[in-house]
Amino acid sequence: MESKIVYFDKPGGDANTSKTLSLAKKRAQELGIRTIVVASTVGKTAARAVGVFKGYKVIVVTHTTGFREPNTQEFTGENRKIVEDKGGIILTTTHALGGIHRSLGPSGGPPPPSLAMGDVIAMTLRMFGQGTKVACEIAAMAADAGLVRTDEEVISIGGTGRGADTALVLQPDYVHHFFNLRVKEIICKPRF
């Protein structure tokens, strides 16, 4: 099998988001994949994704409430309505690679002097880009929530900062079986 990978000159951003969603849809159509997992902080990327992926099962994974500020959910009510009205599913849950051990560190960061295993895994995935780490992590989070099957391929979309810049074809698995998750294809990612 031969497939094209698109590399972006810079991470994140609106232009990359449009291209990432377009490339992901094209590959989903080619492979017959009907489930899309997408990361979204405030909901802007999610609102765009449900528009692009009409007729698909779209699972949007958000930050936890309190991620940036106590008792605050960054995903806006306006974007939540757009996503839900278009049939999208919103999952708000703890980051798979940054759990309870983060409470030991300053400002919710890694606890000194050593890193927990989730941090090591996250940093390793970031060697391929922040979007790659995000796409793998949200797929596992969706599997834990029972929103995706572990025996079917999905397209998982992540990004760097704001917007989407990475799309992967992968077979998800649960967090407790994280190393069984399989990245089958890279559709696009930034070159850094």
Predicted regions and their residues:
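Glycine-rich, aromatic-bearing surface loops/beta-hairpins
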Residues: 152-192
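Glycine- and other small-residue-rich loops at beta-strand/loop junctions that grip anionic moieties
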Residues: 9, 13, 35-39, 127, ...
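Short coil/turn connectors at secondary-structure junctions
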Residues: 31-34, 53-57, 85-88, 148-153, ...
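Glycine-rich phosphate-binding "P-loop"
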Residues: 1-26
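Alpha-helical scaffold segments in soluble metabolic enzymes
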Residues: 23-26, 48, 82, 123, ...
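Long, charge-patterned amphipathic alpha-helical coiled-coil/hairpin "stalk" segments used as oligomerization
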Residues: 87-158, 163
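Long, charge-dense
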Residues: 2-6, 56-118
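N-terminal active-site beta-alpha-beta segment that forms phosphate/nucleotide-binding
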Residues: 26-76
